[in-house]
Curated annotation (Swiss-Prot):
This is Beta-ketoacyl-[acyl-carrier-protein] synthase III. The keyword ATP-binding does not apply. Pathway: Lipid metabolism; fatty acid biosynthesis. Its EC number is 2.3.1.180.
Length: 323
């Protein structure tokens, strides 16, 4: 059977780093308060010349370089973002043009922090269905542009950045030993939409709006939803938590990540943590963490890797793959 295998991974972060100490000078907050509740120590914030598309392009080029491929080898681009360059056309189309790609097709996906997991799952379906051979999947965000910088409960949490992977069709045996994507599951429940949202949009307020969040409500639901969808993936693949080599979770809050790993029975040393470096970068979070683990020499060929994310909506999902 056809599997979608990971050929390469890449990342891009804005030049400017904003530490918790920097935020202390403009908000009634403290480094201790932020670290204790979230695990975040710093985040990257885009400058005026850095956009979702430019960051996505940079991450894509690094992923292509890691894969040993040229832009002309790509026939599908899926960009997960909630902060597109324009209302339309899709940021994916702009990145396609920036890369000089004229073939194939490109589109955006919007599932907020779950976006990259949704995009990987979607690209996998196109590859297994024979509509694409090589896909560039990008998570890119400039969340700093939709933050209310007077709201200390939200603006300290988020950062900007982009991550990308190249997926390629490869023939597998159809069992758990195959390389590539082995199982995936997606969920959404719109009854929670007012717990994490942006209070603007072209069809309603005709403005961009700002991010609003009921942090305690999100935290209350997160661990249960995350572990439920992961257990679904484990069941599909016929594995247990002990079989996992690396757990690459959405990097929103270290307490949520730790609690999810503990409930699932995933050992602490298998959990990838980058929230301290990047903050919550929404759809860019998972590929940024994945790239970090690869660049640090942690994830090796043959490792069983679990990806997971949860975001506004609520949306949530998980992907199991062998590196």
């Amino acid at each position: 059977m056809i599997r979608s295998t990971v050929r390469g991974v890449g990342a891009a972060l804005p030049r400017r780093v904003v530490t918790n100490k920097d935020l202390e000078t403009r908000l009634e907050t403290s480094d201790e308060w932020i670290v204790q509740r979230t695990g975040i120590r710093q985040r990257h914030i885009a400058s005026d010349d850095e956009t979702t598309a430019s960051l996505g392009e940079a991450a894509a080029l690094r992923a292509l370089d890691a894969a040993g491929l040229a832009p002309a080898d790509i026939d599908l681009i899926v960009v997960a973002t909630s902060t597109p360059n324009n209302t339309f056309p899709a940021t994916a189309v702009e990145i396609q043009e920036r890369l000089g790609i004229r073939q194939g097709f490109a589109f955006d996906m919007q599932a907020v922090c779950s976006g990259f997991v949704y995009a990987v799952t979607t690209a996998d379906l196109y590859i297994r269905g024979g509509m694409a051979k090589r896909a560039l999947v990008i998570g890119a965000e400039t969340f700093s542009r939709i933050l209310d910088w007077t709201d200390r409960t939200t603006c300290v949490l988020f950062g900007d950045g982009a991550g990308a992977i190249v997926l390629e069709a490869e023939e597998g045996q159809g069992d758990i030993s195959d390389r590539g994507i082995l199982a995936e599951a997606l969920r959404s429940d719109g009854s929670h939409k007012e717990k994490l949202y942006v209070d603007g949009g072209p069809s309603t307020t005709r403005t961009v709006g700002h991010l609003r969040m009921q942090g305690r409500e999100v935290f209350k639901h997160a661990v249960g939803m995350i572990t439920d969808v992961i257990e679904d993936v484990f069941g599909q693949a016929g594995i247990t938590a002990e079989d996992i080599d690396w757990f690459v979770s959405h990097q929103a809050n270290k307490r949520i990540i730790d609690a999810s790993a503990k409930k699932l029975g995933i050992a602490e040393e298998k959990v990838v943590i980058t929230v301290d470096l990047h903050g919550n970068t929404s759809a860019a979070s998972v590929p940024l963490a994945l790239n970090h683990a690869v660049s640090q020499g942690k994830i090796q060929k043959g490792d069983l890797v679990l990806l997971e994310a949860m975001g506004g909506g609520f949306t949530w999902g998980a992907v199991l793959l062998r590196w």
